[in-house]
Amino acid sequence: MLGAALAFAVAVVASLGAEPAAARAQAGEGDKGERLMNASCQGCHGVRVIQVQAKNAEEWSKTIDAEIARGAKVAKEDIPVLVDYLVDHQGPLPDGRGKAIVLNVCTMCHDLSRIRRGRRSPEEWEETLNAMLNEGAPLGDDQFPIVHAYLSRNFGVE
């Protein structure tokens, strides 16, 4: 029984964001943005630096301009594609208690689009967080209720 529940929880979490990503991949949009990020950004630093910033389009544009000034190789016509990709996958999250934990813990395995699209009831967020703990997420006992409240408040069922 526990094995079936765990398998279900893992399947639910794995399905978060699968359909939109597949649709983008068919259109080739997400692929190009990801390729640009891998080639242009990760040549100097790892993806972790990107994952914890949660910037909007204007902020990502400024960051890219600053990185180009430091020597990053991004063609002018590729900047909007890269910005769109970063906003979609590493874009802004609502402010509030728990945001920093989500950025530092959840993004170790998930991009922010997956978190933003994961509309769930408080009970479903609790199940999801417990499933992630079972998978090895480094979420402390004191952090669990904070993250649970943040996700339930900001990414609840609409």
Residue spans for each PLM region:
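Electrostatic cytochrome c docking/interface patches
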Residues: 18-36, 66, 76-101, 135-137, ...
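Extracytoplasmic/secreted proteins, especially bacterial periplasmic and envelope-associated proteins
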Residues: 32, 36, 59-62, 81, ...
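The canonical Cys-X-X-Cys-His
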Residues: 38-47, 82, 103-113, 147
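Short Cys/His-rich "knuckle" micro-motifs
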Residues: 51-54, 93-94, 116-119
